[in-house]
């Protein structure tokens, strides 16, 4: 009986780790509430899908903006800074893009939202593994 309990608990622990929640950040970008989700937590070296939801001051989804994701790793001894940019595609109420993090370490991410000629940005940092 004791073995069965230990086995069941181990199985639940492994299942919980395998079903990890997305990496999620909620911040303000100017007048907008922005939620960014990366499909891997923690983000990994290689392709990572990012989904961005933007709401205006009245709580309505913003679907008429141009959204660009810029991601960079600062320079290190013997290595220049790495700077990348990817455009997003609107699908439903979410802007979606793919980021390719080329190495492990700390990455700075900026979500730039341009709407009616005005640009706002939300910045956060992730640690790719």
Where are these regions (language model features)?
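Positively charged n-region of N-terminal signal peptides that target proteins for export
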Residues: 1-4
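Contiguous segments within soluble domain cores/interaction surfaces
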Residues: 19-129
């Amino acid at each position: 009986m004791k073995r069965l309990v230990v086995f069941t608990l181990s199985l639940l622990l492994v299942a919980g780790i395998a079903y990890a929640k997305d990496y999620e950040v909620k911040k303000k970008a100017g007048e907008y509430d922005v939620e960014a989700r990366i499909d891997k937590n923690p983000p990994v070296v290689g392709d990572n899908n990012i989904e961005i939801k933007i709401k205006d001051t009245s709580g309505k989804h913003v679907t008429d903006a141009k959204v660009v994701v810029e991601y960079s790793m600062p320079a290190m001894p013997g290595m220049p800074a790495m700077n990348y940019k990817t455009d997003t595609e609107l699908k439903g109420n979410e802007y979606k893009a793919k980021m390719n993090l080329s190495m492990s370490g700390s990455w700075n991410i900026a979500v730039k939202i341009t709407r009616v000629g005005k640009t706002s940005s939300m910045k956060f940092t992730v640690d790719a593994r």
